[in-house]
Amino acid sequence: INWKALLDAAKKVL
């Protein structure tokens, strides 16, 4: 799992 990808997804949801 990529941390940056997870952060990007969270930013999109937020």
Swiss-Prot record:
Q: Which residues are annotated as site, described as Amidated C-terminal residue positioned outside of zwitterionic and anionic membranes most of the time?
A: L14
Q: Which residues carry this modification: Leucine amide?
A: L14
Q: Name one GO cellular component term.
A: membrane
* Marked site: Embedded in zwitterionic and anionic membranes most of the time: W3
Protein's cellular compartments = Secreted; Target cell membrane
Keyword terms? Amidation, Antibiotic, Antimicrobial, G-protein coupled receptor impairing toxin, Immunity, Innate immunity, Mast cell degranulation, Membrane, Secreted, Target cell membrane, Target membrane, Toxin
Q: Which domain of life is it from?
A: Eukaryota
Can you tell me which family this protein belongs to?
Belongs to the MCD family. Mastoparan subfamily.
What is the name of this protein? Protonectarina mastoparan
Species: Protonectarina sylveirae (Brazilian wasp)
